[in-house]
Amino acid sequence: MASPPTEGYEGLTPFLRASLGDGDLPALARQWLDRAGREDTAAAWMNLATALLCLGQTPTAHAAQREALARARTYVLPGPGGSAPRLLLLAMPGPLSANTPLDCLLEGQGLQLLVHFVDPAAPVAEALPEHDALMLTMGVSEAALPVLAALQERLAAWPRPVINPPAAIVRTERASLSRLLADAPGVLMPPTRRVPRVLLEAAAVGAWPQGLEAPPFLLRPPDSQGGHGLTRIDTGEALGAYLAAQPEGEFFLTRYVDYAGPDGRFRKIRVALLGGRVFPVHLAVSEHWMVHYVNAGMYGDAVKRAQEAAFFRTFAEFAHRHAPAFSALSERLGLDYCCVDLAETADGRLLIFEADPAMVAHAMEPGAEFAYRREGIAPLREAFVRWVRGRLEERT
């Protein structure tokens, strides 16, 4: 029998909000450090771990997370409670990028969320709490692959709706995804493959192996997220310098595609796919080819924000223009819910960077200048709740 879910875990929401400027994140971390020491509860340790992960204090955060998981593995997130449907989120222990923080999208609305951190050593033996539907929130990683394989068998005949089945999540691994989308209509995703370090070291000293992509190309470590370890290689000298700084034994390699617009700026779009429909999440505009919303200058540039606001207003037109591509993405991925990072190429195709069920969708930036984002992401939030309720009605 499963232990009762632990109350008091706040999820990522308050810590992400503070990290975006609506609060004092270091003060929150100090508060939870004090409470963990005084109360010694699973929730206090997990809140401390989440705050420390947001601050980038990874080793200390993982130590706090282990303290929490030694006390409890299932936590209730803030929400409506009562008769609201109970959605059990299966999550991986580890970094924030390991799982989609659904609480940041829903912000306490519509569903009662319970998060269960699976035990990677025994993912099949664990007892799970009562729930109305189950959702796998983890993405693909070296740590998650054996867990997903074990869960595939366990959940095959699960008596409740299962959102994002394990086999579909596995298909989002970068090399697998590029093969999956190779001939998808309206889509461009250059082949991605794992390359052993030894081949790259040979190329760096001038012995370019036959079949190795010529520069420019992109390299990244297999488990990297958020651009960590990602670089563009233009010369053998640059390759040597990169390898000197990266200790990994293999890397993902993919051809670089210049997706700059006529003004020289790069625009990366994040959309969410939900039950075959597509929704806007954000548009980031940057002067650099490696675009992330938090470092693209969106917070201090009203012109960039105006472009994102226009993107939300005209998204229906964008989605209609790329309907065959989005239809192919939904069908081939086979995921109920995920986010996709992409750009629009000069020839009108969607350049796919990644598709990941663990990506975050939110509109938690404070201030009136981001009101358009809160309005723009509301349709996804409302549709997600309706979609889950619809899945439950299908079973009755």
What are these regions (language model features)?
Residues M1-L77:
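Alpha-helical protein-protein interaction scaffolds
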Residues T74-A202, A207:
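Conserved N-proximal alpha/beta basic substrate-recognition cap immediately N-terminal to
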Residues G139-E142, P222-S224, A358:
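Short glycine-rich anion-binding loops that position phosphate/pyrophosphate groups of nucleotides
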Residues L181-D183, P190, P209-H228, E248-D263:
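ATP-grasp fold ATP-binding core
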Residues F217, F279-P280, C338, L351-E354:
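Protein kinase-like catalytic core scaffold
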Residues T231-A325, L329:
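Phosphate-binding site of ATP-dependent enzymes
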Residues E331-L335, E344-T396:
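C-terminal active-site "lid" helix and adjoining low-complexity regulatory extension at the edge
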Residues V340-L342:
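Hydrophobic residue at the +6 position relative to the catalytic HRD Asp in the kinase catalytic loop
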